[in-house]
Amino acid sequence: MTVNYQNLKLINKELEAFPRSNLLIVSKNQSQEDILELINKGYSKFGENRVQEASNKFTTSLRKKFNNINLHLIGPLQSNKTRLALNTFDTIQTLDRKKIISEISKEIKKNKNIRTSNYFIQVNIGLEEQKSGVSPDELYNVYEYACSLELKIQGIMCIPPNEPNVEKFFIKLKKLRDNLDKNLILSMGMSADYKPALKLGSNIIRIGSKIFT
């Protein structure tokens, strides 16, 4: 795959109407060469789905050379990858259970020099069995638990069902955020549905397949 700069330019143009929104380039399965090309063109915010793959591509030497890189984990976090994730990512967007929150808290106590500083709670907004995330009813309890362990919860994220009326799920996530804390960031919207997500208040859109074609 190669970077589709025409699509990238179009997305950036669309974002001009939403000054509080940012693009997170989803670079899973992409080469370090393509990532470096984007970095050299001024892009710094990337999302990866797998901890080991991200660690292999966004090496210590790369991070030292380009210290403005902001790397987000947007895939599930397994307990046995907690330490590596905390030393690889600036933000983890996929807190989906108390157990992983507890594991993160334990690692932080062992190592004060971890990289990760911000966290999002993933909400299973469509209550789909095959998807990770806390249910909407569990969100407040999990949020309070994370805060009690002094994790900095920056926002909430979702991956909605693949349905025509995706707007209703974005509206629901926004309402959940407003009831929890209006200052929290909304991470919602991907290649197929980022336009309605932006209109409904998304602060972070996660785009991969529209950029790498």
Language model segments and positions:
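Thr-Gly-centered strand-to-loop micro-motif
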Residues: 159, 207-208
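Expand to "…catalyze enediolate/carbanion chemistry for C-C bond making/breaking, isomerization
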Residues: 198, 209-213
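Divalent-metal-activated hydrolytic enzyme cores
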Residues: 203-204
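Conserved alpha/beta-domain cores
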Residues: 1-184, 190-192, 200
